[in-house]
Amino acid sequence: EYLAGIRDAEIRLSPDESAYIVNLTGKEAEKVLELTKDGAESLFETSVSCIGASICQIGLRDSQELLLSCVKAVRDAEIPDGALPQIHISGCPSSCGTHQTGEIGFRGAAKSVDGKVHPAFVLYINGCQTQGNESMGKEIGTILQKDIPEFLVTLGKTVALSGQDFHTWRNANPE
């Protein structure tokens, strides 16, 4: 509502699913910051997710639901900022959430367990989208959707106990 009243204000969407608000004065920008103060509080909470299967007809999994459950689990576990990287989640192979270029990425899938098909995501690691260092992540395996928040909490606790941030820890523990 606030932006609707500002002449020439625009919201621009980027390829990584983030949004930029442009054509604001300094005071207007400060007001937008105030209105959005309940946003991301850590690097992990700036994670990227496509719109997901709840809206996208191509999407196999609800990537937004996964992201929200992961953020809640990491907040509840009080994982410190820097212990987990920004993750990228795509609900299908189309890669709208750029899962291959994240340090940790997930792509919507299904996994059969005891003859029953369950919602799952394929895990990718070590992708990079930094210009000059671009690389596609390595596909590691498939994790049930319900297990991903706990996987990230365990990883975050492990990294936090090392006293390092995720980047330093990952470089010291490449496997």
Spans of model-derived segments:
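Small-residue-enriched alpha-helical segments and adjacent helix-cap loops
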Residues: 1-115
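Noncatalytic linker/hinge segments flanking ATPase motor cores
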Residues: 28, 54-64, 126-135, 162-170
